[in-house]
Amino acid sequence: MEPDIIRMYSSSPPPLDNGAEDDDDDEFGEFGGFSEVSPSGVGFVDFDTPDYTRPKEEFVPSNHFMPIHEFSENVDSLTSFKSIKNGNDKDITAELSAPVKGQSDVLLSTTSKEIISSEMLATSIDGMERPGNLNKVVEQRQNVGTLESFSPGDFRTNMNVVHQNKQLESCNGEKPPCLEILTNGFAVLETVNPQGTDDLDNVADSKGRKPLSTHSTEYNLDSVPSPAEEFADFATFSKKERIQLEEIECAVLNDREALTIRENNKINRVNELNSVKEVALGRSLDNKGDTDGEDQVCVSEISIVTNRGFSVEKQGLPTLQQDEFLQSGVQSKAWSLVDSADNSEAIRREQCKTEEKLDLLTSKCAHLCMDSVKTSDDEVGSPKEESRKFTNFQSPNIDPTEENDLDDSLSVKNGDSSNDFVTCNDINEDDFGDFGDFGSASGSTPPFVTGTQDSMSDATFEESSEHFPHFSEPGDDFGEFGDINAVSCQEETILTKSDLKQTSDNLSEECQLARKSSGTGTEPVAKLKNGQEGEIGHFDSVPNIQDDCNGFQDSDDFADFSSAGPSQVVDWNAFEDEQKDSCSWAAFGDQQATESHHRKEAWQSHRTDENIDTPGTPKTHSVPSATSKGAVASGHLQESATSVQTALLNRLERIFEACFPSILVPDAEEEVTSLKHLLETSTLPIKTREALPESGELLDVWTELQDIHDAHGLRYQWGGSHSNKKLLSSLGIDTRNILFTGNKKQPVIVPMYAAGLGMLEPTKEPLKPLSAAEKIASIGQTATMSPDMNTCTSDQFQESLPPVQFDWSSSGLTNPLDASGGSTLLNLDFFGPVDDSSSSSSTTIPGVDPELYELTTSKLEISTSSLKVTDAFARLMSTVEKTSTSTRKPKREEHLSEEAIKVIAGLPDLTFMHAKVLMFPATLTPSTSSQEKADG
């Protein structure tokens, strides 16, 4: 059995070795078929179980059922299995997969595309009993799943990490679970080793990330998952590919690009530092004792590094490297948290607080990480020189201005905290593609970027930008959050290998000179910037080196102008000194225009200018300035938003096209013919006339309506029309008895017998029964009576008129009174009860109120004044007031309770319906005198 192979066991019995012949013996069929349905999301994947390298069948009871972490979709994983049959029951068969030679198991999530290498601790320092292994594994687990962290925890000393090419894919993108043993349906951890300690190489943690020592099982069960471990499962937007570390090559493969460092000395340096880190981690665990979680392990590392804060300069290079990689582990933890899309902001804030406490040591860590990978052969062999390079960080007598500058640069623009807040808001358009990979481009840079010097920052960023300028696809969602360190924050330039070496040499000289400058304690920081003659490039380019060799990283704002913190005053002083010694504003504008032109054309290669001033002035690595970072950032954001919108629209278009395939409908052209053309039937050809036979009648109608002056509607008259005759005949009216009266505009059609009918007036006195014709004639005669005839009384006038006889038989009409047999006068005005009492005077009519009658007859009397009319109206109003029924008054004989009286009083009063006459005076208003008389 290979010691580097981790056994992988299936959760369902796969086919036996003898193939399909024994399929009938399996009464439950093939459980592996459920892999296409849905692997259980709860199942057996969330428990911690031991992970053994030796075959399980050697020490596991045969009745144990060992499920695999996922139902596999890969047919290759079912190629070799060993069956173990229970001696008691032949029908129960558990099949265990045999390991694949030369390959380590890889847990692959289909959604996350994350490959996690299971490394063995065969060559761990001080054996399995050393607690340093636990600490190292914890540190390694923080770095798993995030290629942004190019931390030594990802590499092994004297070992090659080999990755399995065959990938086991999950159906629903669940997290890679660990191996476990089921006993009576429960997942348990076997803390006792049946075969001895040597047989148990490691224990998989709850997330299946990295192996832990067997002796750390209690720690693993009691520990709270670290944020890096929590959010590593949500790295569904990242594509992780393998990291290969060989003796002559260190390859960091992000999505489609690779950053390769081929020098042996760099790998040796990484191996050496990794060994130092393991020793330091072991010592930190000894000092801390038993820990309860990975976060506490990190805290112990932080405390050790903090205690060694300013005494580092007294130590040699190995100790310094040890502290640097201790801090780089903490650093890598923050970058591993970026895998979570939803909680990235909260985690960044938390990491920012941690980094602010360790800002000095963070900068040192980044510098040493950078130097350990990228320095030349000369620098590797000179530990004293590297110790001198970091004197400014280690010096306990750092100038307060320098400390403020260092703290500000770390908290605002440097390290993980600044990159989380400053640069993530301004993402380069070329990298703003998907949520797909949070830090593919920054996978090799973030630990080296924080706190780096100006020249080395340029070298790192420009080399990374050489490989990662165009790696995101247009169809990506939210882009690479880690790319902002490599591409969007820095100048988009390309640095060749020769420039890198030259920059590395410049770095050593710069740090040495900076140390000399800071050692005196009198030379201000601003003078370090005097080397940039010929351009004011630090306005919006990478900041220059300061006394603490810790320049601001360039943000997407106005760089030094927008830098917050105590170092603003120093920056402004530097700006003033440089303005005096260097070129004018006009030169700055010209250079800005020139660089803007080159920026628009293509990626501009990096230009290194070494300007030597006075002997005391250090060399500075100047980067050509471009247009204002604000303008560049805004342009990038606008273009990136446009590109993202275009990509999303393209995706939606493809989705709609797939869901709703377009159906080609031929366009039918219809000729719209004008009405005039249709009416000209004589000009139409015969075929057209035959083609429209059904519309012939409609065309005839339009022909009749052509001349609006001769339209039928204008010539139509109701009188004498066909419809009018039909109506009269249906009503039984003879047209000969119709009299047209009135003017021509408003003719009035009345019956012939009603020619003299006027306004209805009350009858004077029913002396004798009169026919309707006589009544109508009398009313008409009265209406046309001249005023001089009114001198006589109405009775005399009525008697002097001869009755008018109407010929009912010749008119064709029937007398309604005769037909009904009525012989009495129909009172059309008032329908009050007829009073038969003898008290009725000759001036009143039975059934009519005397006041109303008096009011009516007063109009007919000739008087010099209207006194009679007003008096009659006053008497009428007084009568109405006496018999007013506006308010309900219950009768005296009614015996009602108070509540009933209140209810009845609230009801509407309808007693007015008992009145004889409903009078609504609208024109007559009594005078005050008559009203007083009526009241009196």
UniProtKB/Swiss-Prot annotation:
Provide one Gene Ontology biological process annotation: protein transport
UniProt-annotated stretches for the region Clathrin-binding: 825-829
Locate the motif WXXF motif 1: 28-31
Q: Which GO terms describe its molecular function?
A: clathrin binding
Where are the Phosphoserine residues found in this chain?
Answer: S151, S395, S518
User: Where along the sequence does the record place the motif called CLTCL1/Clathrin-binding?
Assistant: 716-718
Span(s) of short sequence motif WXXF motif 4? 478-481
Q: Where is this region: Interaction with AP1G1, AP1G2, GGA1 and GGA3?
A: 1-523
Where does the source fall among the domains of life? Eukaryota
> Which residues fall in a compositionally biased region of kind Polar residues?
617-628
UniProt lists compositionally biased (Acidic residues) regions at 19-29
GO cellular component: a single term: trans-Golgi network membrane
Question: From start to end residue, where is composition biased (Basic and acidic residues)?
Answer: 374-389, 595-610
Region Disordered, as annotated, extends over 1-36, 197-216, 374-409, 589-637
Q: Which residues carry this modification: Phosphothreonine?
A: T617
Q: Where does motif WXXF motif 2 map?
A: 432-435
- Does the record carry Protein transport as a key word? yes
Where does the record say this protein resides?
Cytoplasm; Cytoplasm, Perinuclear region; Cytoplasmic vesicle, Clathrin-coated vesicle
Task: Name the residue ranges of motif: WXXF motif 3 (partial).
Answer: 436-438
Q: InterPro entries attached here?
A: Aftin-like (IPR046359), Clathrin-bd (IPR029205)
* Notes on the domains: The WXXF motifs mediate binding of accessory proteins to the ear-domain of AP-1, GGAs and AP-2 through hydrophobic interactions. Selective binding to the GAE domains of AP-1 or to the alpha-ear domain of AP-2 is tuned by the acidic context surrounding the motif and the properties of the second residue of the motif itself.
Provide the assembly information. Answer: Self-associates. Interacts with GGA1 (via GAE domain). Interacts with GGA3 (via GAE domain), AP1G1 (via GAE domain) and AP1G2 (via GAE domain). Component of the aftiphilin/p200/gamma-synergin complex, at least composed of AFTPH/aftiphilin, HEATR5B/p200a and SYNRG/gamma-synergin, which plays a role in the AP1G1/AP-1-mediated protein trafficking from early to recycling endosomes. Within the complex interacts with HEATR5B/p200a and SYNRG/gamma-synergin; the interactions are direct.
The entry's function note states: Component of clathrin-coated vesicles. Component of the aftiphilin/p200/gamma-synergin complex, which plays roles in AP1G1/AP-1-mediated protein trafficking including the trafficking of transferrin from early to recycling endosomes, and the membrane trafficking of furin and the lysosomal enzyme cathepsin D between the trans-Golgi network (TGN) and endosomes.
Know the name of this protein? Aftiphilin
Organism this protein belongs to: Homo sapiens
Q: Which gene encodes it?
A: AFTPH
